Amino acid sequence: MSAEGSMIVVDVSEGNIEDLCRLCVPREREDDTGFAKGMELKKAWVSGMLRRWGSVAKVAYLENTPAGLIQYVPVPDEKVVRILCIFVPHEEHWRKGIGKSLLTSLIEDMRSPKEWLGGEPPSALVTRPFPGEKPGQYPAKSFFRDMGFKQVEGDPGLLCYPLRRGFVYRPVERRGPEYVPQEDDKGKVVVIYGPSFCPWSYVFLERSVKEIKEAIPGVCVRWISSLEEPAEAEKRGIPEGIIVNARIIGTFLLNDREAFLKEVFIALGEN
């Protein structure tokens, strides 16, 4: 825990998960059923990560009000900590040093030995900032650069903050999970979902299904929760995604709606 004036930065625990999750949800949509489900899934994710790692997020409080967050996960085989996001959602809390306080607190914490690294401190913090800031909001990529993060060679979107002198970050190449086609998935839409660090993930899945239903009235949709039907999710090989006629949809709706729907139609053979 660290404090600066009327601001205090606190590690997330089971006692303040609610504060962390609510910072992710727009105030005007707190009663939205999609976000309610998304928050439920985020709470499950945080609880699981706390049991596994002990520390995965911090919340900044300004005058006792949750004002900002930073989320991160250890990556033991790379000896680094990956920052998933840093977020100060409300304009009245901007330009008050909240983001800086959150990141500074994390940097201080990660200079100490960690059990998950055999008693050694991490070698670096790494992050891949994503766009989406509101008008007038400090872009995350600019913030991290101003805080001393440097671009990783060969990857303009990846930034690194070394904690050990001379450390050069070289990401481990990984293959993402691959969908295992199922006979039961033919002729329908199947949505796999489960615990997620971001409540928007479920909202985006809902929005994608809505677009599909509007484009293809009467299409059959099956939702599979990895929490409620773990065996069904596991045999398909992916933790989250949209499957159409036993084909995984790779296009993200918000990136390109037209391309998303085209991929759906092709999967259904309705080109």
Map each language-model feature to its residues:
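Non-catalytic, surface beta->alpha helical segment in thiol-disulfide oxidoreductase systems
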Residues: 244-271
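Short amphipathic alpha-helix that is part of the acyltransferase structural core
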Residues: 1-48, 59, 199-200, 204-208
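A short, internal acetyl-CoA/4′-phosphopantetheine-binding micro-motif in the GNAT/acyltransferase core
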Residues: 85-98, 129-131
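Conserved GNAT acetyl-CoA-binding A-motif
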Residues: 110-136
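Local sequence-structure signature of Cys/Sec-based thiol-disulfide redox active-site neighborhoods
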Residues: 178-214
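Conserved beta-strand in the GNAT
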Residues: 59, 64-74, 80-82
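Conserved acetyl-CoA-binding loop-helix of GNAT-fold acetyltransferases
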Residues: 94-112
